[in-house]
Amino acid sequence: MPEVIFNGPEGRLEGRYHHSKKEDAPIALILHPHPQQGGTMNNKVVFEVYQLFAKRGFSTLRFNFRGVGRSQGVYDEGLGELSDAASALDWLQSANPDASQCWVSGFSFGAWICMQLLMRRPEISSFVSLAPPANKYDFSFLAPCPSSGLILHGSEDTIVPKESVAALTQKLQEQKRIKIDYRIIEGANHFFHNRIGDL
């Protein structure tokens, strides 16, 4: 799990990278929760998802948004963080020019950024969105959603009500040419405490 440093829009960004031994391995980018609420690339959910992708043969990158850890810059209300994610994906693609697929995943705030990146990068083939904060952020830009994916949500999440995630999921499931798998993790709260293994 080597440490990597790559250029972002506002300076250096730090990450952790797992490189698959297979030349045409798929790639996955993992995005962390809100930088101003303690979110980092070392978040337990982010780390677990990173490990799961790596175990499935993906070349996988997780990184700190601007102003977090050793990443340069300051929080930018999501706009700059989306640019950071695009730079991270550029770096990941340059390290894996023969990748067979491109996936993105995000947790909470990271899920919101992940879905915006999905709209801007047609090479992204699928996504995994964990506890997308549909009660706090506008997801109407997903019209239409360009790729199939998975939405995970805890049944006991008190930060993001299940009604808001269910409504978002239903809107996506009504769209043609994509498949959205919606799974509720029973007993899990917003942070999937004691349920991370169920992911």
Predicted regions and their residues:
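N-terminal cap/lid segment of alpha/beta-hydrolase-fold proteins
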Residues: 1-23
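Gly/Ala-rich beta-loop-alpha elbow adjacent to hydrolase catalytic centers
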Residues: 106-114
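Alpha/beta-hydrolase fold nucleophile elbow
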Residues: 96-107
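Alpha/beta-hydrolase active-site loop
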Residues: 45, 75-96
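Acidic catalytic loop of the alpha/beta-hydrolase fold
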Residues: 156-160, 190-191
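Short beta-strand/loop motif that positions the catalytic acidic residue
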Residues: 145, 150-153, 157
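C-terminal catalytic histidine-bearing segment of alpha/beta-hydrolase fold enzymes
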Residues: 175-199
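Short, surface-exposed "cap/lid" segments of acyl-processing enzymes
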Residues: 21-64
